[in-house]
């Protein structure tokens, strides 16, 4: 169920971003917009169509779905201890122990995490959107800082992307060498791009794709930091979306 909520949230943030494109309205900082638009054009008009998207299409079409699921489960399992720590830091020991249990069961019984044994055994142990250190900072109201579009990386803020580097201090992530970390990041990026292939039309139809991507980034991280909730006072469409999420959760 949580995965369904996360998937819907990811999709709806793309739509919500169009209706709330004002940086001042959202309280976002984008002082480098000129530079960011240049980097966006490189990332999404050069790098994506000629390199990233073809790789993602090949990944989706030629890698069997069970193999994709297994690799996604494995890379996600590496983050479970860090997610556990972040829930403890947020004052939520119950969710912290949920992620400890997921890591223990999937590592021992799930071939090192390739099989999500915990999620199959108990719906309360299903995989969720990971809470990283950036989410913990957001939980306590720390601001994003300036928004930046980085070449090859995409959207970046000091709070969420810079803060997430703290997660690498915890095992198992701290055990990874630099090439291993790059490999993990690459696999996750390709899988994420493959999942979003069917959403390419949203960007093509947008009058300002840069604004759409920027606001989708903020909306997604707000959603995670707020524990899976959208605040109506921050967006005029949030209440309607929140009602849809509740309807799905009640199924």
UniProtKB/Swiss-Prot annotation:
<protein>
    <recommendedName>
        <fullName>Intermembrane phospholipid transport system lipoprotein MlaA</fullName>
    </recommendedName>
</protein>
<keyword id="KW-0732">Signal</keyword>
<keyword id="KW-0472">Membrane</keyword>
<keyword id="KW-0564">Palmitate</keyword>
<dbReference type="InterPro" id="IPR007428">
    <property type="entry name" value="MlaA"/>
</dbReference>
<comment type="similarity">
    <text>Belongs to the MlaA family.</text>
</comment>
<feature type="region of interest" description="Disordered">
    <location>
        <begin position="228"/>
        <end position="251"/>
    </location>
</feature>
<keyword id="KW-0449">Lipoprotein</keyword>
<feature type="signal peptide">
    <location>
        <begin position="1"/>
        <end position="17"/>
    </location>
</feature>
<keyword id="KW-0843">Virulence</keyword>
<dbReference type="GO" id="GO:0009279">
    <property type="term" value="C:cell outer membrane"/>
</dbReference>
<feature type="lipid moiety-binding region" description="S-diacylglycerol cysteine">
    <location>
        <position position="18"/>
    </location>
</feature>
<keyword id="KW-0998">Cell outer membrane</keyword>
<comment type="function">
    <text>Involved in a phospholipid transport pathway that maintains lipid asymmetry in the outer membrane by retrograde trafficking of phospholipids from the outer membrane to the inner membrane. Required for intercellular spreading of S.flexneri.</text>
</comment>
<dbReference type="GO" id="GO:0120010">
    <property type="term" value="P:intermembrane phospholipid transfer"/>
</dbReference>
<dbReference type="Pfam" id="PF04333">
    <property type="entry name" value="MlaA"/>
</dbReference>
<feature type="lipid moiety-binding region" description="N-palmitoyl cysteine">
    <location>
        <position position="18"/>
    </location>
</feature>
């Amino acid at each position: 169920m949580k995965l369904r909520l996360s998937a819907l949230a990811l999709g709806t943030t793309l739509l919500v971003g169009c209706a709330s494109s004002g940086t001042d309205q959202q309280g976002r900082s984008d002082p480098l917009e000129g530079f960011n638009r240049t980097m966006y054009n490189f990332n999404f008009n050069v790098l994506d169509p000629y390199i990233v998207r073809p790789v993602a299409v090949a990944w989706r079409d030629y890698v069997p779905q069970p193999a994709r699921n297994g690799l996604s489960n494995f890379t996600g399992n590496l983050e479970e201890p860090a997610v556990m720590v972040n829930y403890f830091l947020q004052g939520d020991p119950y969710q912290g122990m949920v992620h400890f249990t997921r890591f223990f069961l999937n590592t021992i019984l799930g071939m090192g995490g390739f099989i999500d044994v915990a999620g199959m055994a108990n719906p309360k142990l299903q995989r969720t959107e990971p809470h990283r250190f950036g989410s913990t900072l957001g939980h306590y109201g720390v601001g994003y800082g300036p928004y930046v579009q980085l070449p090859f990386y995409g959207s970046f803020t000091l709070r969420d992307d810079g803060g997430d580097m703290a997660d690498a201090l915890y095992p198992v992530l701290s055990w990874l060498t630099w090439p291993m970390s790059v490999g993990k990041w690459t696999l996750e990026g390709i899988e994420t791009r493959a999942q979003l292939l069917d959403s390419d039309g949203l960007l093509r139809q947008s009058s300002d794709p840069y604004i759409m991507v920027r606001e989708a980034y903020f909306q997604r991280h707000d959603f995670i930091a707020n524990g899976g909730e959208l605040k109506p006072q921050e967006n005029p469409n949030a209440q309607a979306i929140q009602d849809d999420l509740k309807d799905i959760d009640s199924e």
